Amino acid sequence: MSAIFLTGTDTDIGKTVITTLLVHFFQKRNIPIFSFKPIQTGAIQRNGEWYAPDPVVYEKVTKPTSHNEFYGILLKKASSPHLAARLEGVQIPLQEIKEQIAFLETKYEHLILEGAGGLYVPITDEGYCMIDFMQELSYPVILVARAGLGTINHTVLSIEALKKRNISIAGIIFNQLNVDDHEIEEDNRIMVKKLTDVPVIGSVPYMDNLIERLKEEEVRDQLISNWDEKRLKGVLLNDAGSAIK
């Protein structure tokens, strides 16, 4: 069994889209993989039942035994996990979530875990953060960053935080969240690589109605067409040297 942890430089950076595309990327190469969201906030209600919004997107490429197999805990408020849990009067059962991940490791050959928010989003009121959870799991990390203006600072700071914890970094995927200045975006990729020495393993171009269009295989193929196949396969299949610290 092997796994990748996917995180982002911020919330609403496109982690769920990238997670879904990563599943498609590996499925196209006959590598089975299952996506899992350990902590989901911002539940949505349908026909009187609560659903996890990110796994609803996963279902465009994966059919689980049941919807709730995709996540560890579902909290209603769209906020950082510590606040959402406090408002519901519950504690996030970290040990149970880790046990659920351990079970999934026995059920599926490969996993991709999607974090909530960025590295330092609090999970508990005591200050236990997503980066602490990631460090305990010890999976190599893919960092999702926006492509446009301002991303250099956010991305470099996130990479430095991961390196300080000795967390293995598989690479960076840039996500174009809107139509931006191409010259800035290209320079961002060059400068981030220069400042961090972490490879850019892919980028996702801007597309209207992207989440809805993920159900189209042709669109998914188009979005992953420039991804670094050798590196991604190496990271997932535990090829030494494919991830850096």
What residue ranges belong to the model's regions?
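Hydrophobic anchor at the beta1->P-loop junction of P-loop NTPases
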Residues: L6-T7
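Histidine-anchored nucleotide/phosphate-binding helix
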Residues: L22-H24, M130-F133, N153-K164
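Switch II (G3) loop of P-loop NTPases
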Residues: I97, I101-Y128
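Inter-motif core of Ras-like GTPase G domains
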Residues: T124-A147
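C-terminal lobe/tail of nucleotide-utilizing enzymes
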Residues: E160-K245
